């Protein structure tokens, strides 16, 4: 109850016109937990049309604009988000360190990441307010998505296992291949649609192999990412939700 601010969410779900979630497995779990007669509708976390394109101009941060300009000949492995126990990324920094100098690892975060500053090819960048962070996203070579199930936090491990990150759509909008860890929410999006690689273990060896795999098959992964994004008809599901 504390997680729902005192609201009886089961009672609310039964009284609702439509119940909407953002991922297929979450729909199944919600129906089972709440004993709903109807499977909840699924509306993805795909951002609304935004006008950004590959290698967009950086307009909201002079420091970011300068960094991106300095990296114009580099291949950016990009992570954008919180860095914590649920999203450990040091193995990626180590992997990029071991690969050739055409690659750099960029971390855009508000988290303190002192442990990453020792890596020569890791670049830290502060947040840029949404949606303008997508200007930086548009310059990435590979996008990173990490969701590690943890216990003892206010959310269930299922929140990570059946993640539905908007990042999948932000990266795929630009045809950026992705690397994720091996959980259903990423395996059955990234790998199922052949738009990237899910590593079997979160270590330097597997991240390095994944980066090389994407580099060797870049056009295929990139094309599939664009198709995945274009095939998500969010507006149609919204229309369905509004029907009686």
Each language-model region and where it sits:
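Nucleotide-sugar donor phosphate/pyrophosphate-binding loop at the beta->alpha transition
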Residues: 1-12, 59-60, 85-86
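A short, active-site helix/loop in glycosyltransferases that binds the activated sugar's phosphate group
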Residues: 5-42, 47-55, 188, 192
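Conserved donor-binding/catalytic core segment of Leloir-type glycosyltransferases
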Residues: 20, 44-54, 60, 65-87, ...
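Short hydrophobic "strand-cap" motifs at the C-terminus of beta-strands
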Residues: 22, 79-81, 108-110, 125, ...
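A charged, aromatic-enriched C-terminal amphipathic alpha-helix characteristic of glycosyltransferases
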Residues: 44, 53, 58-59, 201-203, ...
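Nucleotide-sugar-dependent
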Residues: 87, 129-138, 143-173, 180-188
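Nucleotide-activated donor-binding/catalytic signature segment of Leloir-type glycosyltransferases, i.e.
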Residues: 107-142
């Amino acid at each position: 109850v504390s997680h729902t601010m005192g609201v009886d969410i089961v009672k609310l779900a039964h009284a609702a016109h439509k119940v909407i979630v953002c991922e297929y497995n979450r729909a199944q779990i919600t129906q089972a937990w709440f004993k709903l007669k109807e499977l909840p509708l699924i509306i993805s976390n795909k951002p609304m049309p935004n006008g950004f394109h590959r290698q967009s101009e950086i307009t909201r941060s002079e420091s970011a604009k300068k960094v991106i300009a300095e990296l114009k000949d580099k291949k950016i492995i990009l992570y954008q988000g919180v860095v914590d126990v649920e999203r450990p990324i040091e193995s990626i920094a180590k992997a990029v360190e071991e690969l050739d100098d055409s690659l750099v690892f960029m971390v855009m975060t508000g988290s303190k990441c002192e442990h990453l500053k020792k890596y020569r090819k890791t670049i830290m960048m502060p947040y840029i307010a949404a949606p303008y962070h997508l200007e930086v996203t548009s310059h990435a070579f590979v996008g990173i998505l990490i969701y590690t199930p943890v216990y003892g936090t206010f959310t269930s491990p299922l929140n990570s296992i059946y993640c539905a990150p908007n990042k999948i759509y932000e990266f795929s909008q630009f045809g950026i291949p992705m690397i994720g860890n091996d959980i259903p929410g990423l395996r059955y999006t990234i790998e199922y649609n052949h738009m990237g690689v899910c590593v079997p273990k979160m270590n330097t060896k597997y991240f390095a192999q994944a980066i090389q795999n994407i580099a060797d098959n870049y056009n295929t992964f990139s094309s599939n990412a664009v198709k995945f994004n274009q095939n998500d008809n969010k507006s149609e599901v919204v229309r369905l939700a509004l029907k009686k």
